[in-house]
Amino acid sequence: MRSGRRWCGRWLAVLIRDVEVERHGRVDVRVVAGRVAEVGARLGGSGGIDGRGGALLPGLHDHHVHLAALAAEAASVRVGPADVAGPEGLTQALRGGAPGEWVRAVGYHESVAGDLDRAILDRFVADRPVRVQHRSGELWLWNGAALRAAGLDDAGDGRFWRADERLRARTPPTPLDLAGVGRRAAARGITGFTNADPHPAPELRTLLRPLPQRLTILGLDRTAPVKIRLDDLTLPTATDLAARITRARPRPVAVHCVTRVQLFVTLLALDEAGSVSGDRVEHGAVIPTEAVDRLRMLGVTVVTQPHFLVERAAAYEKDVAADDRPHLYRCGTLRAAGVPVAAGTDAPYGTSDPWAVMRAAAGRVGPEGLTPRAALGLFLGAPLAPGGASRTVEPGARADLCLLHVPLREALDDLSANCVRAAFVNGRGISA
């Protein structure tokens, strides 16, 4: 595809011809200085990109992702239920590298080979350091060779819960394929990410600089929400959580809620501290019916992962309490009640393909299902206003754009990344 770029005075100008833009029909779009300058029929100017009638959308924004972990996947062994079967398959996967070299395995779930600890991993692999990450992202499992190599031989059973910061300095650096992450995201029409690590290192923004997408980093960016991660075993009282929320003000908060009790404590705390625009519940894995109106009254956005119901169906059937299953990863009923809803892939702990998330949301049966257009809208909110009004291709708008091969109606029939032709950030193409 020709770039269609030229210089207009000091500013880069891009003309995209014959594209379908919502509320405008088939038009031309001119971009100047990183923003949409004109939308109209047969705009003047030479050259340009021929859109061939494909839809031109605002670029997709993944509202919840863990970018460093996603970039580390290329140097990792996948050992989830879809990748290996049983202790034999796990052992074979872990033995794939050279003896003595560190093995970083990701995506593990107990359905593969049961609960793991140091002794069990040593029976599988003893001649090289092995660390296995649970698919929740919150638990690392190390064998004896890894513990000895890291100077942690006295670390008991080798199970480390939420200890990434402690462990990071004791392991060899993991190569990060940020170029690959950015390239694959661009091919799916993603022009922005919200990184949702609970404790981002101060140097994270510098680390992620190779990505061509626009970045929002929870906790680091002064205008972004502060991430608060809850755990049932160490759950604060509502009053203690309210005090923590108050300390974060005037910034909004993004509270990790994956259980019923975490959600109720969060709602009580927000009621006590007072909610502000931009407050978010991350995941909203279990939202009982009685909590929906409270979310609406507090004005809290839910950033959810409907694809987990597809990816983790067997585990949820086995592990989730029967009275919680009807309330998993709500979408449609939240929207119907006036609760803002957005989606994030939660990659690498879920698929990194937002179109797969859309298909999961649109494919649900009953009141939680969304129309394909509403499913697309899960990724069209502004970075700091997920679940709010969808961004639009209008004069003055930032030129973060997604060009499709086909009109929008056809794209909504498929909800597939195959429909994506190109992505632009500030009017500059970031994919071929």
Give the location of each predicted region.
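Active-site microenvironment of metallo-dependent hydrolases
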Residues: 2-42, 94-98, 174-187, 191-192, ...
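Extended hydrophobic/aromatic segments used for targeting, binding, or gating
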Residues: 207-226, 287, 293, 417
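Short beta-strand segments
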Residues: 104-107, 217, 343-344, 403
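Glycine-centered helix-coil hinge/cap
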Residues: 40, 126, 219-221, 318-325
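Divalent metal-binding segments
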Residues: 9-209, 222-246, 252-258, 262, ...
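His/Asp/Glu-enriched, well-ordered alpha-helical/loop segment
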Residues: 249-254, 263-279, 283-284, 289, ...
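Flexible loop/turn segments at secondary-structure boundaries
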Residues: 111-113, 139-140, 192-194, 200-204, ...
